[in-house]
Amino acid sequence: MKKFMNTADDFLKESLQGFGAAHQDIVSVYYDPNFITRSQPTKDGKVALISGGGSGHEPMHGGLVGHGMLDAACPGFVFSSPTPDQMLAAAEKVDSGAGVLFIVKNYSGDVMNFQMAAEMMQGPNESVLTNDDVAVEDSSFTTGRRGVAATVLVEKIVGSLAESGGSLQECKALGDKVNQNSGSMGVAFSSCTVPAAGKPTFELGADEMEFGVGIHGEPGRRRDKIKPAQDITNELLEAIIEDLKPNSNDETLLFVNGMGGTPLTELYLVFDNAKKLLDSKNIKISRSLVGNFCTSLEMQGASITLTKLDEEIAKHWDSKVHTAAMRWGM
């Protein structure tokens, strides 16, 4: 195992310390329990957005804390769910009286712990569950579909509504709508190594890929031989289109996400290949995002997310955002 680390026990804490020091104008990092908030207090009357999950998926979620997105994020240990006390401490810190919206990826530990935190909270709260992965219905981590890269889009779009004064119920409704109008699927060319484990999560041959892989290395639909990029892209996107059923001339947001170990050169190539398929079906790409946002440590691979847009979703996607990982309009 080759990683920049001192000890596995200190890996997360040192990473959080570095993140906080590098972005102290945007975030504040708290310890025991670990959570991240904006550096400035939540505005009175603003719905507070909180998300979280296992570390190793950076910049999701800590890198998405800031103006126009999250108010707080709860990082668990690598690929392990955060605990209810983290979520409760974060909620108590950022709740300004308008309520708290938890954005939760559909993994059993995340769902259970966020539900426990919600039950312990004194004030009003709601949850949005993301389950955009069309690859499999059930996995070792979930009952039902997994929550993956569309979570980033939910956090951006709902974050905009919350910033503009949307109510708790309005924010939940928009989050549910974005999730329902999004589909994702990924492929891995390599595994990844959790620091505490010291060995790859799974094994892949030099000429193999895991098609439909999860963000923790969960098995996908099948293991196959590497193919040309256009063939891989077409299969990922066709599975999403079959699930979403966009109409001809529908406007969409196309998000090509890196898993952590794939260079941007290749991600833009995938975007080009995806555009060719969507153009052939008269599905319009009116918004786009390319980069490493929902990663799996050093895994080589990529995922594609397609989101059907309406005027409300597009407006909140375009609005100002300033986080460590995403910034425009400021």
Give, region by region, the residue ranges found by the protein language model.
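Short alpha-helices
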Residues: 128-170, 174-181
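C-terminal non-catalytic interaction/assembly regions of soluble proteins
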Residues: 239, 244-330
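Short, acidic/small-residue loops that bind anionic groups at enzyme active sites
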Residues: 73-78, 121-144, 280-285, 289
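N-terminal amphipathic/basic leader segments beginning at the initiator methionine
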Residues: 1-49, 311-330
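Mixed-charge interfacial surface used for oligomerization/domain docking
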Residues: 164-269
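Glycine-rich oxoanion-binding loops at beta->alpha junctions
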Residues: 57, 64-96, 241
